[in-house]
Amino acid sequence: RIARNNFQLIKPKVTCVIINDNNDQLISSIKKEMKIFDETIVANIQKESFTNKINHFLNKNDIQCYQYDNKQEIQNDILQYVHCSWCVFLEVNENFDKKNKDILYNIFSLFSEAIEKENITFTFYNLKNNEYYHAHAIYSQYNHSSNINVELNI
């Protein structure tokens, strides 16, 4: 209860990794997520090149973009580029509305005692059916590491 009440005071910095397989939706998705997260990275699996408009937008906003052949490659690789405490992975076509934002903060509050540990990463999967969310937090300190899994059906 106390940790939950104080959660806003210790809100960690959060990176959003947008998994992009739809260039047409990319800029609007980034604009939406930039309001919520401290850092945005694009993991691009779209084969076609970005338009000049998208390239200009990414450069102007200092958004890093990395190219992948498939989604399976993304998670472990992208974490080396993350500068924040927690990392959230979102599909580019999903709607991250207020309801989902509240869910995300509720998940964070469950792990509030882990926030000060070292090497925290956090993944939040927003799946296509918009009903099922899987959260996975990993933290390690010294030689000890723990895995925390949360599954939410909404």
Model-assigned labels for residue ranges:
Residues R1-A3, Q72-L79, C87, E94-I154:
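Catalytic-site signature of metal-activated, phosphate-bearing donor transferases
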Residues R1-K32:
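N-proximal low-complexity "stem/linker" segments adjacent to membrane-targeting elements
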Residues K11, V82-S85:
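Active-site acidic short loop of glycosyltransferases
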Residues D21-Q25, K47, K71:
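Short beta->alpha connector loops
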Residues I30-D69:
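Acidic donor-binding segment of Leloir-type glycosyltransferases
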Residues I45, H83, L90-V92:
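Active-site acidic Asp-centered loop
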